[in-house]
Regions:
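Conserved NTP-binding catalytic cores of kinases and kinase-like/nucleotidyltransferase enzymes
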Residues: 2-90, 213, 230, 324-325
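Active-site acidic catalytic loop and adjacent metal/ATP-binding pocket
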Residues: 43-54, 58, 86, 186-231
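ATP-binding pocket architecture of kinase catalytic cores
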Residues: 52-139
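A cross-family kinase active-site recognition segment
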Residues: 117-172, 198
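Loop-centered beta-sheet repeat module
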Residues: 164-195, 202-203
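All-alpha amphipathic helical-bundle segments outside canonical DNA-binding/catalytic cores
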Residues: 270-282
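ATP/Mg2+ or Mg2+-diphosphate-binding catalytic cores
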Residues: 288-325
Length: 325
């Protein structure tokens, strides 16, 4: 799931818009005494670094099933996964305000991911460990993935927006992208009925949600859900380098993907069924997670790094046969 927030005005959750309070109000519900409007430390959503005694903490939005997410992440932490869990405060944490949940996490000091082979390997290893700790059923009552209802009209609209944004940036979009996306629409019911193995997962496993200490530390587990395992793997393949200043402005190379998988497979044995459906899954996750990203935000096409990443993703979508499991 992807969230873009224009703070103090609106939250954009894919194509839905809801009103939200200002930053001062958010901090005050946790008894942080602030008078001036805080500045987010993250450009795409409200993330506020504040002091709690001698400790630096972060206040951010979490999802509707906040308690489920916290139970899940506490389990991961107990298993030895480096993941943030709620700070113990004098008030409830997380808290709800006007139907929006917010949580206070510790601020984690560390280095940023830079695309080195050892960083890629350790990231893959971490995701494999996370998946290995999932139960066979949705024990933590996490949100269940159910996005199998895209239609051709949505693809047509999405492609119109993508082509328009690209033209303004002086870029031509390969028509093969639309062909692939329309084909993905036809595959949705096949995937829905495939009964692929599901896992509990943070489901937003990408570089900008990791801090290296030097091992990876997951600082944003708030999109946690119950999802087909290889859907989560495909999302990491596609968007691991999204919205990250230090990361390469492209998808993984084939060699890098194999390094990521080598770490992942230390804990996970993928099934033959997953390997059979992998090509369709890559296309479906692009349809669900990447198409709207390219179509929704014209300004990203004017940023050199995002523009290069988008073009890399398009080339990937047209021919990703060598990215195997």
């Amino acid at each position: 799931m992807n969230i873009y927030i224009q703070f103090s005005v609106e939250i954009f959750y894919k194509h839905k818009v809801v009103k939200v309070m200002n930053g001062t109000q958010i901090l005050n519900i946790f008894d942080f005494d602030v008078e001036e409007e805080p500045v987010s430390i993250y450009p795409y959503s409200p993330v506020y670094r504040v002091k709690y005694g001698d400790q630096d903490v972060v206040v951010k939005r979490t999802q509707s099933r906040a308690e489920s997410v916290m139970s899940y992440t506490n389990m991961l932490k107990d298993k030895g996964i480096n993941v943030v869990t709620p700070v113990k405060l004098q008030v409830d944490n997380p808290q709800k305000y006007e139907d929006i949940n917010f949580v206070v996490y510790p601020f984690i000091e560390g280095e940023k991911y830079s695309g080195k082979d050892n960083e890629i390997y350790e990231a893959g290893k971490m995701l494999g460990q996370i998946h290995s700790y999932s139960h066979v059923s949705n024990e933590y009552n996490l949100l269940e993935y159910d996005v199998y209802d895209f239609n051709k009209e949505e693809v047509e609209e999405g492609m119109e927006a993508i082509i328009l944004h690209a033209e303004k940036a002086g870029i031509r979009i390969d028509p093969g992208l639309k062909t692939k996306l329309l084909g993905s629409v036809a595959n949705q019911q096949v995937l829905y009925h495939a009964e692929l193995p599901h896992v509990a997962t943070p489901h937003d496993f990408k570089a900008n949600n990791l801090v290296l200490i030097p091992d990876p530390y997951l600082i944003d587990p708030d999109n946690a859900g119950w999802i087909p395992r290889i859907f989560d793997l495909a999302l990491a393949l596609l968007l691991f380098h999204n919205e990250h200043e230090e990361a390469p402005d492209r998808v993984f190379t084939i060699d890098e993907w194999e390094i990521f998988l080598s770490g992942y497979k230390e804990s996970i044995v993928l099934t033959n069924q997953e390997k059979v459906f992998w090509e369709k899954v890559k296309q479906h996750v692009f349809l669900d997670e990447v198409m709207w990203l390219m179509a929704e935000y014209e300004e990203d096409w004017q940023k050199s790094s995002q523009q290069k990443l988008f073009m890399s993703l398009i080339h990937f979508m047209i021919d990703s046969a060598n990215y195997r499991l």
